[in-house]
Swiss-Prot record:
Gene Ontology cellular component terms for the protein in this record: mitochondrial inner membrane; NADH dehydrogenase complex
Organism: Oryzomys palustris
Gene Ontology annotations of biological process type: mitochondrial electron transport, NADH to ubiquinone
This protein's record includes keyword ATP-binding: no
Subcellular location: Mitochondrion inner membrane
Enzyme class: translocase
Transmembrane segments: 4-24, 55-75, 86-106
Record GO terms (molecular function): NADH dehydrogenase (ubiquinone) activity
Function: Core subunit of the mitochondrial membrane respiratory chain NADH dehydrogenase (Complex I) which catalyzes electron transfer from NADH through the respiratory chain, using ubiquinone as an electron acceptor. Essential for the catalytic activity of complex I.
Subunit structure: Core subunit of respiratory chain NADH dehydrogenase (Complex I) which is composed of 45 different subunits. Interacts with TMEM186. Interacts with TMEM242.
EC numbers on record: 7.1.1.2
Membrane topology: Multi-pass membrane protein
Protein name: NADH-ubiquinone oxidoreductase chain 3
Main location: mitochondrion
Length: 115
């Protein structure tokens, strides 16, 4: 009963917030809001600098590997149970996937900073 009440409350609250956000007026964006502000002076250069695609790909790769490594954090707590074979097998599979992914990125020159 408590679970049903909590889920109903979450659904009603999220629906209410979504409908309020939908019906609120949207702020107007005009040229002065979209331009960069540098202490009252005209901007010295364009605010839209070219972004290196290589940097973006290295950043995304780092983010993916970082999130996958975060899956390894609960292993010390999982090792306290009596059946550690399943934990060790899952850990070995996860580390193997990470190693294969790193080797794939390395062979495809995804970790090279210069082009």
């Amino acid at each position: 009963m408590n679970m049903l009440l909590i889920m109903l409350t979450n659904i009603v609250l999220s629906s209410l917030l979504i409908s309020v956000a939908f019906w609120l007026p949207q702020p107007n964006s005009y040229v002065l809001k979209a331009s960069p502000y540098e202490c009252g002076f005209d901007p010295m250069s364009s605010a839209c600098l070219p972004f290196s695609m290589k940097f973006f790909l290295v950043g995304i790769t780092f983010l993916l590997f970082d999130l996958e490594i975060a899956l390894l954090l609960p292993i010390p707590w999982a090792m306290q149970y009596t059946d550690t074979h399943l934990t060790m097998a899952a850990s070995f599979i996860l580390v193997s996937i990470l190693t294969l992914g790193l080797a794939y990125e390395w062979l495809n020159k995804g970790l090279e900073w210069t082009e």
